[in-house]
Amino acid sequence: MGPAVESPEKVKELIEAGMNMARLNLSHGGYEEHQNRLDRVREAAKAAGKPIAILVDLQGPKIRLARFVDGPHELERGDIFTITTDEVEGTKDRVGTTYKGLPGDCKPGDRILIDDGKVTVEVVEVKGNDVVTKVIQPGAVSNSKGINLPGVAVSVPALSEKDKEDLRWGMKAGADFIALSFVRNAADIKDVHAIMDEIGFRIPVIAKIEKPQAVDNLEEIVAAFDGIMVARGDLGVEMPIEEVPLVQKRCIELAREAAKPVIVATQMLDSMIINSSPTRAEATDCANAVLDGADALMLSGETSVGAFAIEAVATMARIIARTEEGGFEMIRTLRTTPKTKGGAITRAAAEVGAIVGAKYLVTFTQSGDSARRMARLRSPIPIVAFTPEVGTYNRLALSWGVEPEVTPMVKHTDEMVKQADTLLIQSGRAHIGENVVIVAGSPPGIPGSTNAMRVHVVGDAVGGVAPAYR
């Protein structure tokens, strides 16, 4: 979300074009601005009758240049350029940085990338608070441009003071997900959970994979966090660019195996910031992410500041739909066997559904866990998830192939089946006499207690009679 889609009309158009989740990037803008955006999304989602998740994306400990007196400044190859932790007015030769630990983390020979690698400098020496560098790749530098140190394990905390305040705001504002930037290992989630526990509840945390250390610790990160974002922007700066496609595939594979949603982000349709149609390479990139098994594809500048925001969403939605329609069998099946009771039951339900020709796979879920386990299987049978929790309803918008519905809590399994009958028939999803496979926990109301599967004939629980031709 951003200036290009501020009006209620634009938000409505985004949803109509295919948006499932709105991202609030707290690297830019104030709380009032983001609260207004969140409120507009909630209002438009309610009017459309669709689940739309809200993702609050924390800036993270991004290392940046400080401000220049004037500028931007063009650096030429061979120029000496000093980055200092002193409070200085920036010039072409010397500028400050937001990261006070920079001199301690650098050594001669290290390369520093500025503005996503548009400018490259090499450390010549470290003198007190100054990191003296020589320009290797020339280009322009200006206020607050990001700094990357490939291969250097910078000693920054997982959460900056700004991130802590932003997290508290996001929780109170009603976010469905929090995205944590520059995750390095599983322990990075501890500070997030500590603040959530102070507030009194937790919401899912998405780990942004954009550092080499995160790639090295990918399995433990997937286990500790609630989802993954393949943040290819910084990842492609911090690592050799040729590694990024393989990292993307591994992230998706591990997240799917763990039944956790995975988002592929950055430059998906980048040319649509200024053009009304994407490049062929961008269209293919989107399709390949779908075939890799991603749950969601993310647009950034395309919709926040782009000239063709609505068109970008509609274009991406068409690419996704066509890829799934024509290439569904190319999506890799999971190679792992279920490790939990819930995993075994959802897998069995998908297999039985295929055998009996089920119209839908139906899950009753409080936490969304059984729906996510079903989604990772990529069954061609659509999934309906009935939940009494509005938060779960919104969050399941991120999971592949799930159609969530809010339903009242019931106390008995038979009541759940009646609910399924009533809602499937009323919504027109299924007709009397058709088969569905229902997955639930018995007794109802206990999160994570999936232990039952049944093949159900629609209408049986409400006294329906199938047409004779069936």
Residue ranges of each PLM-predicted region?
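Non-catalytic helical/linker scaffolds that mediate oligomerization, partner binding
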Residues: 1-470
